[in-house]
UniProtKB/Swiss-Prot annotation:
The complex is composed of two ATP-binding proteins (BtuD), two transmembrane proteins (BtuC) and a solute-binding protein (BtuF). The keyword Transcription regulation does not apply. Disulfide bonds join 185-265. The record marks 74, 204 as: Important for BtuC binding. Its main location: periplasm. Belongs to the BtuF family. InterPro entries: ABC_Transporter_SBP, ABC_transptr_periplasmic_BD, ABC_transptr_vit_B12-bd, Vit_B12_bind_prot. This is Vitamin B12-binding protein. Pfam families: Peripla_BP_2. Residues 25-272 form the Fe/B12 periplasmic-binding domain. Coiled coil: none annotated. The gene is btuF. One of its GO terms (biological process) is cellular response to iron ion. It comes from the Bacteria. The lineage of its organism: Bacteria, Pseudomonadati, Pseudomonadota, Gammaproteobacteria, Vibrionales.
């Protein structure tokens, strides 16, 4: 279960193993990396992607060479890519090392901040035929972030709980993705200080922390009524502050994260207006 969840939650940092020059055959090994590749102007160079790469629509038509269980090492080598966009937090380290041993150039993408989304687009754009496309996408992303920061009041905090899965109940802690999206909007994570990056928690622990807002997503719950019996114990339920987020927007650090920010910030603003 945790491996499946991690497919949506990449950690963002990047490193390059080759000189920046245009490439012709690109493989992406994570859904967020696929979206970043398109934004960077490499969409027409992609020849294979990860199993859950479904955006943009064209990505869904490409050959699938990885999933939460691992990567198809022999197939990737046979495709002779001149750039693989890898995700160290989700792709097996031993398999990535084997790709390197076969001389496959790898761009490593892991997570950190919203700014890293723009940085990764810029870096990958250097491998496209027209780097200006990716540079513009990165610039537009930064400008929209600035506009959103000016629009929403983030000084007044809202205590929230974000549910990543149902059985077991898993959430996010610390600065791990997508915590920064919620922080951007003035959110205060009720499990922020938990040691594990994606801790398993109990219903009782959630109730004890009394979140004002409870966020889920379509990937998080099969039973929409799992919290209903706790309405009297949870402020979020008593005040109808339970919302389902678009999991692709919120869990993948890509240009579409801007949509997640708007979604989360609007929910928080509605809570503040009722105070």
């Amino acid at each position: 279960m945790m491996n499946k969840i991690c497919l949506y939650l990449p950690l963002f940092f990047s490193s390059l193993t080759m000189a920046n020059e245009p490439v012709e055959r690109v493989i992406s090994l994570a859904p967020h990396a696929t979206e970043i590749a398109y934004a960077a102007g490499l969409g027409d160079k992609l020849i294979a992607v990860s199993e859950m790469s479904d955006y943009p629509k064209e990505a869904g038509e490409l050959e699938k060479v990885s999933n939460y269980q691992g990567i198809k090492l022999e197939r990737i080598i046979a495709l002779q890519p001149d750039l693989v966009i890898a995700w160290p937090a989700g792709n097996p380290a031993k398999e990535l090392e084997k790709l390197k041993q076969f001389g496959v150039p790898i761009y490593y993408s892991t997570t950190g901040t919203l700014e890293d989304i723009a940085n990764n687009i810029e870096q990958l754009s250097q491998y496209s035929d027209d780097p200006s496309k990716g540079q513009k996408a990165a610039r537009d992303f930064r400008e929209e972030l600035t506009a959103l920061k000016a629009k929403y009041n983030t000084t007044e905090k809202v205590r929230y709980f974000y549910q990543l899965s149902e059985k077991p109940i898993i959430t996010v802690a610390g600065k791990n993705w997508p915590s920064e999206v919620f922080n951007f909007c003035g959110g205060e994570n009720v499990f922020a200080n938990t040691a594990a990056p994606y801790p398993q928690v109990s219903i009782e622990q959630v109730i004890t922390r009394q979140p004002e807002v409870l966020f889920t997503s379509r990937h998080a719950m099969s039973d929409d009524g799992m919290w209903a019996q706790w309405k009297n114990e949870l402020p979020a339920l008593r005040n109808n502050h339970v919302w389902s987020l678009n999991s692709d927007w919120i869990n993948r650090p890509t240009p579409r994260t801007l949509n997640a920010i708007i979604e989360v910030c609007e929910h928080f603003e509605s809570v503040k207006r009722k105070r």
